[in-house]
From Swiss-Prot:
Efflux pump; part of the gene cluster that mediates the biosynthesis of the secondary metabolite ustiloxin B, an antimitotic tetrapeptide. Probably involved in self-resistance through the export of ustiloxin B. Pathway: Mycotoxin biosynthesis. It comes from the Eukaryota. This is Efflux pump ustT. One of its GO terms (cellular component) is plasma membrane. Gene3D superfamilies: MFS general substrate transporter like domains. The chain crosses the membrane at residues 59-79, 146-166, 180-200, 216-236, 240-260, 316-336, 359-379, 398-418, 421-441, 449-469, 481-501. It is a multi-pass membrane protein. GO terms for molecular function: transmembrane transporter activity.
């Protein structure tokens, strides 16, 4: 992942621990008067509150590896899980149609089977991501929350495995309850929020986009390798990658426990003391459990009021709104598999190659195109970092819109592949949008804002999952070109996201 580094001297990574005050991008547009008194340097520039015991490169690598391990465990079961779901639905459908068990299954690509598959998978994704709407988790230590969230994700996958292992005991729709386990720690939302906040705390402006890109590159490597690998293993037995993913997740939890530093959020130690202090005092002065909970809730509300000045900035709100539909880019992966399998009668192992294609293009974008564009816009066009990030985000948005629309119109496998390629060129939308947003927010509010961003991402997923599932059902019922109706919806939503980014003023 070193190929994602922009053309800046490598010693910048080690120098930031000693000289970070020259990063003028950290002059915030938000909360300037209040925060200036607490976190500015003598020359008036904001100084990011970071843990200087850890090198930014180390934090970026650890966050990327944690993402890689977690995402491999999640991605390797994408195709096998769809195959298992489809088999259970198909068997039940033809048993009901024939009126007798034991008769052979027919074509599993028929509309009733695929509609039920879209319904179950779409609502499962929604319920899985409802626990992701947490705000205050990062106040209790990033490492602790990260570990608990990973355990919750593991238990969630185990529940799905139990339901599908005993289809005669549990109805398949019982997989919708897998989200309950992700209440433990906040699920994938907390993993994402903690990793990105750790990077934002430790990396200066000129390295931030690269660090974010490394995390996204880890996700892409997982997709590039694990999705087709899981599909290939599913040809032998779909349960092989399912059990393998659980083992890999356990290893990931052990890795995070040993390697991830126990870093508190930037600015967590305030004038009134650290979170640990107020928790201790709560236990001393309020011995009952109920009163302790009440004290913690009041403290959370007070802290939110202190940190909520960024809510009044319209430009920040516009950027955050664009993240609401950004997660659709990730969710389209599962839709693409089922769409290609249903429309062109592909097996899931063949359809999974589309995911690998997208991941390969994404890696090229992060390794070559983004650094090149950044260099050209800064050196040749003399744009500052904030404007540069905005322009690249707009380009990414256009690619997402065009790619989604082409996939909607795809009448042949070649057109679908072309649309997927164009769509993949815009995958870095969230990378540069995060950097764009970070450059406009006071460092003291980074943890809070990034938790808000993650909430917007998963809020979009919670609403978008059943929405795309329903549109896929409609498309399958209408047939023809309308099978790709979810991609038309995605194109419309990405257009709204591009409009929000364009409307945000960059100073």
């Amino acid at each position: 992942m070193s190929g994602t580094s922009p053309p800046t001297p490598k010693d910048h990574i080690t120098m930031v621990d000693h000289d970070y005050s020259d990063c003028s991008e950290d002059v915030s547009l938000i909360g300037a008067d209040r925060e200036h008194r607490r976190s500015s340097t003598p020359d008036g520039l904001y100084q990011h509150k970071i843990n200087r015991h850890y090198n930014p490169l180390y934090i970026a690598v650890v966050a990327s590896l944690t993402f890689l391990i977690t995402d491999i465990a999640g991605q390797i079961i994408v195709a096998p899980r769809l195959a298992i779901f489809e088999h259970i639905i198909c068997k039940a459908y033809y048993t009901q149609v024939s009126g007798a068990a034991g008769t052979g299954m027919g074509d599993c690509k028929v509309e009733p089977v695929q509609s039920e598959l879209a319904l179950i998978n779409g609502w499962r994704e929604m319920f899985d991501n409802i626990p992701g709407t947490s705000y205050t988790l990062d106040r209790f230590g990033r490492k602790k929350v990260l570990l608990i969230a990973m355990v919750g994700c593991l238990l969630s996958d185990i529940w799905v495995g139990v339901v599908t292992w005993f289809p005669d005991t549990f109805p398949l729709r019982a997989v919708w309850f897998s989200g309950i386990w992700q209440l433990i720690g906040g699920g994938g939302a907390s993993i994402s929020s903690m990793a990105f906040a750790m990077i934002a705390d430790s990396c200066p402006a000129d390295l931030r986009t690269t660090a974010f890109s490394q995390v996204h590159a880890a996700v892409l490597v997982a997709e590039l390798v694990s999705v087709p690998a899981g599909a290939a293993l599913a040809n032998f037995n779909p349960w092989i990658p399912v059990f393998g993913a659980a083992i890999f997740m356990v290893l990931g939890i052990l890795f995070a426990y040993v390697v991830v530093p126990d870093v508190r959020p930037a600015g967590s130690k305030r004038e009134g003391g650290s979170d640990g202090d107020f928790l201790s005092s709560a236990q001393e002065s309020h011995p009952t459990w109920l009163m302790s909970i009440h004290h913690r809730w009041r403290k959370i509300v007070d802290e939110f009021r202190k940190d909520s000045s960024w809510i009044r900035d319209v430009n920040v709100l516009l950027i955050m709104a664009s993240f609401f539909v950004c997660q659709l880019g990730r969710m389209i992966s599962g839709i693409t598999l089922q769409y290609a399998a249903a429309k062109f009668h592909w097996k899931f192992d063949k359809a999974s190659l589309l995911v690998s294609l997208r991941a390969g293009v994404n890696l090229f974008v992060l390794a070559a195109i983004i650094p090149a564009l950044s260099y050209i816009l800064v050196k040749r066009f003399k744009l500052n970092d904030v404007v540069k990030d905005k322009r690249i985000t707009q380009i990414n948005g256009v690619c997402l819109i065009i790619g989604s629309f082409v996939m909607f119109l795809a009448a042949s496998p070649g057109t679908l592949v072309f649309g997927q390629t164009v769509f993949a060129l815009g995958f870095a939308f969230s990378v540069t949008a995060r950097s764009f947003l970070t450059g406009m927010v006071d460092p003291m509010h980074i943890g809070t804002v990034f938790t808000g961003v993650t909430t917007m991402l998963y809020g979009g997923l919670v609403i978008g999952s059943p929405m795309l599932a329903k549109t896929l059902q409609w498309g399958l019922q209408l047939g023809g070109i309308w099978v790709g109706l979810p991609f038309l919806l995605a194109a419309v939503l990405f257009t709204l996201a591009l409009g929000a980014i364009s409307a945000a003023r960059s100073y």
